[in-house]
Design a protein with these regions (language model features):
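Hydrophobic alpha-helical signal peptides and transmembrane signal-/tail-anchor segments
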Residues: 1-9
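Long, charged alpha-helical interface segments
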Residues: 158, 163-246
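Short, Lys/Arg-enriched N-terminal segments with co-localized hydrophobic residues
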Residues: 9-21
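General beta-strand structural signal in soluble alpha/beta enzymes
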Residues: 29, 53-56, 74, 95-96, ...
Length: 246
């Protein structure tokens, strides 16, 4: 089986052009950075998710984007009672958890998304200034692989996902794509269509030479015999969080 990951195309003259997603997708919105709320709103309009689930503090992003989730999950340490009442009055269900729990709010929201049996889950606001939270959310990608559901982290600038088989990236020439071995060694790695190609390579933790590669012609092929690769793909060539976008 071959997986295809499509990048969002950014054109200065006409804004963002994106493919219409035909698979069943569920959005999970967490409380980290996601960039311009308009990007989330546009993606909700084009991807037509089957449901939007909020992890506690992610409600502020949804409020800014004008989106009402079907469900809010968490310990409510970032969502005051007034906002909880606001969402409940609009038909949103809230599942409240104690603060003393083993799961993060984002993980709880992801589990609710899995119950809907989607083909894909897009987790918004999963990255940001809290490195520990970002690492926790990256680790959640493994649960998607275990269930056969494609899970990715996404914001205005990039998406992050795991690769465990031949994968075709459809995007735009010049897009930065970084690849890292995840949870051990990745063997038999072959990259085609990238500025820096590889043939039957072994990638190991502690040797991050897969950082800052680039798509050459808008299409790259990633193959591996064993292990997992963590992919980080930036949508706009040369544009990264915290940098000017003129």
């Amino acid at each position: 089986m071959v997986f295809y990951f499509f990048a969002f195309r950014f054109s200065p003259g006409d804004g963002v052009q994106r493919r219409r997603h035909m698979k069943k997708v569920v959005f999970v919105v967490s409380g980290g950075d996601l960039g311009d709320p308009a990007f989330l709103r546009e993606q909700a309009a084009t991807a037509a998710p089957a449901a939007v689930i909020c992890a506690d503090g992610g409600a502020r992003h949804l409020e800014a984007a004008g989106i009402i989730p079907v469900l809010i999950v968490g310990d409510m340490d970032s969502l005051d009672t007034q906002r909880q009442a606001y969402y409940e009055a609009r038909g949103c269900r809230i599942i409240r958890h104690t603060r003393r729990k083993d799961e993060t709010d984002t993980e709880l929201a992801l589990h609710e998304a899995f119950r809907m049996e989607p083909a894909e889950v897009w987790i918004w606001g999963a990255l940001g200034h809290r490195v520990d939270h970002a690492l926790a959310n990256i680790s959640l990608l493994v649960q998607g692989k275990q269930k056969g559901i494609e899970v990715k982290l996404i914001d205005e600038w990039c998406d992050v996902f795991l690769i465990d088989r031949r994968t075709v990236l459809e995007g735009e020439a010049g897009q930065t794509v970084s690849l890292f071995p995840f949870a051990g060694q990745a063997a038999g790695v072959t990259l085609t269509g990238f500025e820096f190609s590889l043939t039957n390579a072994v990638m190991e933790i502690g040797r991050p030479y897969g950082v800052s590669n680039r798509l050459m012609a808008g299409r790259g092929i990633i193959e591996l015999d064993s292990g997992h690769l963590l992919a980080v793909r930036y949508f706009r060539p040369g544009v990264f969080p915290g940098e000017a976008t003129e």
